[in-house]
């Protein structure tokens, strides 16, 4: 049996998608809840002389998916305040001046559809379309996602760029430090299938 499955994706900066197992519910619609403990959001930001690496934690998520129509609903939330690069001074600057994480504590991806099919076994490549709300603004996104289903587990991986300066966040560059205007995000999501 073939089933389409979503995964997000997310995030950001800041963001965004997560994967989980889908459990059958009424009318052929599949339901899923996110496993934040086994999902990761990593980011890299290029800068003169070095590259900044960091992480965010997934806060929560729940999805509903209709394989027949490709319609997907729900939300995946990333805890922006959890952003960590391993350097306290840089992290304080990032949270206070770029992310404004006290004012905007979450980045939320709200998917609306899946393009492509997910097989019940093995790997599948799909695109997940939806809206990313980050730093108080909504941004339409289509995220390529690789989904692997094996036995009772699901793994989803997504890589995408977030143009954070274009999206209204402050460029932390100064006379001595120049950084990229876009951050690369890599999301790995783990879930368990229920039948």
Language model features with spans:
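Low-complexity, acidic/polar, glycine-enriched regions of mature
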Residues: 19-195
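Bacterial N-terminal signal peptides
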Residues: 7-16
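N-terminal cationic amphipathic segment used for targeting or macromolecule association
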Residues: 1, 15-18
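Bacterial N-terminal signal peptides that target proteins for export
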Residues: 1-7
